[in-house]
């Protein structure tokens, strides 16, 4: 009988880690869990990333485990081992494990999860960097030598030559895979990616002491943290489908002088300027409820967030990032703004780094190359501020996976200096290990510095490039009033919808506006099927969908309401 105590909000990975120590196996990937005694069920690590509560485990539920033995005699207990998880209200969740069997030896491999399409494409590519024949070559046209042979996508000299500060995510993945896994021996597969974890284990696998803070040992405390600038980036480039998208967003500051925040909706595509690169293509900026000020803003509850996400998903789009303005007029009356963010101040403030990390944690990158099915995030942060010459320019960033882990463990917080992050003290159940940051000095030597009480935010930043396409082909038009701009006099109401649709030439082209689509959904006039017709027409541009829509009772009702509102 096994008894494992975890909080209801704890990741199921904590249960598995202790379970593995009690079974005759060290391989989490060989464990399968089912709620039926005669069913193999799901691979256990596919449940990681979700809490015990999210998985729906209740007191008395039985779970059955199947695993591969690593050589030790299998357990032959007639009684079922029992795992209990303690919830926040003190109740125990019983997880009974019976009928443990040894399945046929099956080679492990990557997880079966739904990755983004761009990851599926790049997984199939090696990304080798082709080189032409050089003057140093001493062979014929069909020969190859060290001076012209292809380079791997993670080659440091190539990155230095091209001025790439970071390698791409898939180049990083391939580099680790190359050293960890043998292509000719699939049975020895090891997941190449692993997220850093700076949390103390409140359920020590040794079982020799009470949970922290009443007890602690080397098996449950996190190791010393050494921060250094991340060598790879999850996304290499941010591309706005049309400059109008960004200009319309900045217009709110130009009109009112208050700052603005928006969520970037788009998709991820291959970026051919970087080996195995990824770019975020932004098709729309949705502005959630907020209260803007001259030097900041306050985000308000966003009640229809799920509805907006569902509309975007129906169009093949999803959240790819966030953007906000930090603009101050220079006073020169020539349209220039102050340059506040530069190498001698900061690029993202400490509070913005924390916000970016929280958004990245909320929007994880799903991957088959990690035991947990997750690794970091592709969520980007774009700040619109003043350039060195007083121009308005966007700059795109991400924070490192170490920043995400620091946030999860509640180790960092903001400080009075925007360029510095403060390290919290150990308190209650929060344990903060020693933290250092590492950098290369002017002599090329690595120097470690104690990060307490504060350290520069630059050690958590990853910079991205951004641009507009030379030949734009955006999915949407930006003509309907943007949401939550009532303070500017831009209203999304029946009158504005009537005027907007009245300009339609009759081909449904006015439907190609993300803000109008979210407004239609918010009114609730169209039925679910009728709204699906609208979104299907916008995505596929099939006139059959449009003809069915205009003849539907919901659309006719919508038009009648608009006509009567004028």
From Swiss-Prot:
Keyword line: Cytoplasm, Endoplasmic reticulum, Membrane, mRNA transport, Nucleus, Protein transport, Translocation, Transport
Family: Belongs to the NPL4 family.
GO BP term (any one): protein transport
GO cellular component: endoplasmic reticulum membrane; nuclear membrane; perinuclear region of cytoplasm
Gene coding for it: NPL4
A Pfam family matched in the record: NPL4
Main location: cytoplasm
Membrane topology summary: Peripheral membrane protein
Listed name of the protein: Nuclear protein localization protein 4
């Amino acid at each position: 009988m096994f008894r494992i105590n975890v909080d209801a909000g704890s990741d199921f990975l904590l249960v598995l880690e202790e379970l593995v120590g009690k079974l005759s196996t060290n391989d989490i990937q060989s464990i399968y869990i089912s709620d039926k005694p005669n069913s193999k069920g799901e691979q256990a690590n596919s449940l990681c990333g979700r809490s015990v509560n999210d998985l729906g485990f209740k007191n008395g539920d039985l779970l059955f485990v199947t695993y591969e033995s690593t050589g030790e005699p299998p357990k032959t207990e007639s009684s079922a081992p029992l795992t209990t998880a303690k919830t926040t209200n003190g109740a125990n969740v019983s997880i009974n494990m019976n009928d443990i069997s040894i399945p046929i030896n099956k080679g492990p491999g990557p997880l079966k999860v739904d990755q983004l399409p761009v990851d599926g494409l790049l997984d199939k590519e090696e990304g080798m960097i082709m080189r032409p024949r050089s003057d140093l070559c001493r062979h014929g046209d069909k020969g190859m030598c060290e001076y012209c042979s292809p380079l791997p996508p993670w080659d440091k000299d190539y990155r230095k030559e091209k001025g790439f500060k970071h390698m791409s995510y898939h180049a990083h993945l391939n580099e680790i895979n190359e050293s960890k896994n043998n292509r000719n021996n699939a049975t020895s597969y090891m997941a190449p990616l692993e997220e850093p974890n700076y949390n103390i284990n409140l359920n020590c696998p040794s079982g020799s002491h009470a949970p922290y803070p009443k007890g602690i040992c080397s098996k449950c405390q996190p190791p010393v943290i050494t921060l250094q600038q991340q060598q790879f980036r999850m996304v290499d480039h941010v591309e706005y489908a049309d400059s109008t998208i960004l200009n319309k967003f900045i217009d709110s500051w130009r009109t009112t002088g208050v700052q603005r925040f928006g969520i970037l909706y788009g998709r991820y595509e291959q970026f051919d300027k970087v080996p195995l690169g990824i770019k975020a293509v932004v098709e729309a900026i949705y502005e959630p409820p907020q209260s803007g000020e001259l030097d900041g803003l306050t985000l308000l509850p966003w009640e229809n967030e799920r509805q907006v996400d569902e509309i975007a998903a129906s169009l093949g789009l999803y959240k790819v990032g966030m953007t906000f303005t930090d603009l101050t007029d220079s006073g020169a009356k020539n349209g220039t703004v102050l340059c506040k963010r530069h190498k001698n101040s900061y690029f993202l403030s400490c509070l913005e780094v924390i916000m970016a990390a929280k958004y990245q944690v909320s929007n994880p990158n799903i991957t088959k190359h990690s035991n947990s099915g997750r690794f970091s995030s592709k969520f980007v942060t774009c700040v619109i501020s003043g350039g060195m010459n007083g121009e308005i320019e966007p700059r795109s960033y991400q924070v490192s996976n170490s920043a995400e882990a620091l946030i999860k463990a509640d180790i960092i917080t903001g400080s009075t200096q925007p360029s510095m992050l403060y390290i919290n003290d150990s308190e209650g159940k929060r344990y903060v290990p020693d933290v250092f940051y590492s950098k290369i000095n002017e002599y090329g030597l690595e120097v470690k510095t104690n990060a307490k009480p504060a350290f520069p935010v630059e050690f958590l930043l990853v910079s991205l490039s951004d641009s507009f396409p030379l030949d734009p082909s955006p999915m949407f038009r930006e003509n309907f009033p943007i949401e939550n701009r009532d303070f500017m006099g831009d209203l999304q109401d029946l009158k504005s919808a009537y005027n907007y649709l009245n300009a339609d030439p009759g081909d449904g082209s006015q439907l190609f506006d993300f803000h109008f689509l979210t407004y239609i959904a918010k009114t609730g006039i169209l039925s679910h099927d009728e709204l699906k017709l609208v979104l299907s027409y916008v995505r596929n541009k099939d006139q059959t969908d449009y003809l069915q829509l205009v003849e539907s009772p919901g659309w006719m009702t919508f038009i009648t309401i608009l006509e009567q509102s004028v």
